[in-house]
């Protein structure tokens, strides 16, 4: 399935990837060095995701599962 991470205000595509889950898409974005400032990650299930090194300034993380 194709997952897309979009800018929270403009809706511009920041990163997209065909993979098994949105969590894997976010991890791949972080690993590739994608700029995730102002990303719309609200409500995402990111439980156990490796976000080390990610810059998420201004990102919408409301309701995201980050445990």
Which stretches of residues belong to each language-model region?
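Extended, small-residue-rich solenoid/repeat segments and analogous flexible loops
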Residues: 1-60, 65-67
